[in-house]
């Protein structure tokens, strides 16, 4: 089984919440913390991401979120 997870750039995130709404697994949430630009930012719950990329595709900020998918032992990304 592949392991996928979002990586959020806390400085670039502007708390628009589009990724939270787009996530079918509801693994993202708005942090109570504030970044250096004065915005709250999104955080990952730590498990449950299926690697669909909805968060990445709906984010209006370039480089604010990426989805990483780890390779399986055989080098493939399929589980």
Swiss-Prot record:
Q: Where does [4Fe-4S] cluster 1 bind?
A: 13, 16, 19, 59
Supply the SUPFAM superfamilies for this chain: 4Fe-4S ferredoxins (SSF54862)
- EC code: 1.2.7.7
The UniProt annotation places [4Fe-4S] cluster 2 binding at 23, 49, 52, 55
Positions of the 4Fe-4S ferredoxin-type domain: 4-33, 40-70
Q: How does it assemble?
A: Heterotrimer of the VorA, VorB and VorC subunits.
Identification of the protein by name: Ketoisovalerate oxidoreductase subunit VorC
| Gene source species | Methanothermobacter marburgensis (strain ATCC BAA-927 / DSM 2133 / JCM 14651 / NBRC 100331 / OCM 82 / Marburg) (Methanobacterium thermoautotrophicum)
Q: Which gene encodes it?
A: vorC
């Amino acid at each position: 089984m592949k392991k996928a997870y979002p990586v959020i750039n806390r400085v670039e995130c502007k708390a628009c919440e589009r990724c939270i709404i787009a996530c079918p697994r509801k693994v993202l949430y708005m942090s109570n913390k504030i970044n250096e630009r004065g915005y709250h930012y999104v955080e990952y719950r730590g498990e449950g991401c299926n690697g669909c990329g909805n968060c990445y595709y709906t984010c209006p900020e370039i480089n604010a979120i990426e989805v990483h998918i780890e390779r399986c032992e055989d080098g493939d990304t399929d589980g």
